[in-house]
């Protein structure tokens, strides 16, 4: 991962999963001020490129799932393309869950959709907590488990996206 693709380095932050959003915003604003064309000697093209990198780094670090993927890559963990493993029984559970969510969306049952949304949010919170713990514990053996958790987490995010699209975002 190059500095340009390492969001932590781009913003000058320590490569850590547990970053504070205010810290990310502060680092972003400091670096954005440095990216002004006047500071860069009037080089508008360089300023524009740097602002693009800063915006992407900020977006990655403010999104827990994207931040975890970036940190996993930095630590040499498996890429999602190379490791599609999931927790035991997870895929069957997700197939059943997706079916029930689709049924709730088809029937426009606002209460069931709200209930499933709350379930998905609690699942997301659980993945954030597990991934955070695994990164804090360290060790290369945990990197494989981080990937497995991220693969499962992505399924939950897709369910949330499906509910948002199907319910017109009014189910939250």
Residue locations for each model-derived region?
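C-terminal accessory/regulatory regions appended to core domains
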Residues: 1-172
């Amino acid at each position: 991962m190059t500095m340009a693709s390492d969001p932590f380095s781009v913003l000058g932050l320590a490569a850590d999963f547990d970053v504070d959003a205010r810290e990310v915003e502060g680092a972003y604003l400091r670096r954005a001020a440095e990216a002004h064309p006047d500071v860069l000697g009037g080089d508008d093209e360089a300023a524009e490129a740097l602002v693009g990198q800063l915006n992407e780094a900020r977006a990655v670090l403010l999104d827990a799932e994207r931040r975890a993927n970036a940190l996993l890559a930095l630590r040499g963990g498996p890429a999602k393309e190379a490791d599609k493993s999931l927790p035991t029984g997870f895929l069957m559970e997700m197939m059943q869950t997706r079916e029930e969510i689709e049924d709730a969306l088809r029937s426009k049952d606002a209460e069931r959709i709200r209930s499933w949304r709350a379930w998905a949010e609690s699942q997301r919170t659980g993945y954030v907590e597990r991934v955070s713990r695994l990164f804090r514990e360290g060790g290369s053996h945990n990197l494989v488990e981080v990937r497995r958790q991220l693969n499962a987490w992505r399924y939950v995010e897709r369910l949330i996206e499906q509910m948002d699209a199907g319910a017109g975002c009014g189910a939250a």
